């Protein structure tokens, strides 16, 4: 059974902690966040100091992109260290002999339970042995996994930004226009669904 430590409990980190904590194929050993916030529903303990990592197989860095390299250099561990960013290169954690990337191209919210089954996990690793461990961990979450290098992953992440952020902006503008005349967004829900279905099935 793979033992995991998660550093960072924002939306993604919390969702991963919850999933790993419930899993029969991996075990969450502990988690760390800067605010020392205990996540009540987790069986695993809050770690007081991320510099002192308990014995585990994989440390996942679910932290802001600009903090990855700095945090990686402060970690003292022989475990695999993997970050979860779409735009940061594998080399950001290369100070560890065994390192990788565990990227999920999805938007996560604290108020919605993540459904990982259908998300394609994008993996990158320093060697085949590390990739095997990331594959095992990934299989506990999703049936879809893909190996991408840092350049491919960066382009995928940019495409995800267009697909998510720009579409949400258009939805916001739509809602604002309707609100000016006290019109309900529900009127356009069939149109929104049809537009998305056509884009997915027939192309934009």
Label each region the model flagged.
Residues 2, 79, 119:
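Nucleotide donor/acceptor-binding cores
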Residues 16, 35-114:
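Rossmann-like NAD(P)(H) cofactor-binding subdomain of soluble oxidoreductases
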Residues 113-159, 163-200:
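Internal alpha-helical scaffold of NAD(P)-dependent oxidoreductase catalytic cores
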Residues 4, 27-29, 81, 99, ...:
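Hydrophobic anchor at the start of a short beta-strand
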Residues 1-48:
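NAD(P)+-binding Rossmann beta1-loop-alpha1 motif at the extreme N-terminus of oxidoreductases
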